[in-house]
Every structure is written in structure tokens, then in C-alpha cells.
């Protein structure tokens, strides 16, 4: 049987400091969030500085992820906020640690 790579898909909600929300879908959440953070492509998220990962869900099937993305995009803002705040009440950037440089351990002789 040939090797078959497993895929996963993420539906995510990004937010800005001012509270602007953006919903998207991707097959590589870490890479996609990094694109939003460094504004490597123009558009809505770059214009409104929407680069904080507030919420995400993982799906095995792309069709399920797209269906969920469309569902969330159809929700009123209040319902989206309730979804975020259920798991992330302080609106912390869930990707913050993904992009920080690794901690460097200092040895006694380096101090």
C-alpha cells in the first residue's frame, strides 16, 4: 500500500488590538498565522493589523473545515465573541510562543 500523508485543516479566528475579527481556513495553521503576522500579503488583515490568533478548530476533512468557516462567517459578532471567550476569555494570542526565539540557557562560565 502506498504511503498516504495525513492532512489536517484549521478554521481560525484572528483579532486585532482594536477588536477587528477575521475568520479563515488553512491546511498549515502555523505558516498561515506567520503570514498574517508579517503582513507578507496585503488585504484585510494587513490593513487592519489583524494578527492575533484567538481561536481555532482542527478538522480532518477540508470540506468540514470549509463548512465550519462559512458557518462562523455567517454568525453575528456577538456569537463569535462568545465562542472566543468560552476558551480564551482574555483574548490572548494563542500563537505567541510559536514565534518567539528559543530561550538560551546561560552556563556559569558565561555569566
Question: What is the predicted role of each segment?
Answer:
Residues 29-30, 61-63, 77:
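Residues at or immediately preceding the N-termini of alpha-helices
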Residues 70-83:
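Short arginine-rich
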Residues 58-73:
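Mid-chain, well-packed structural core segment of small domains
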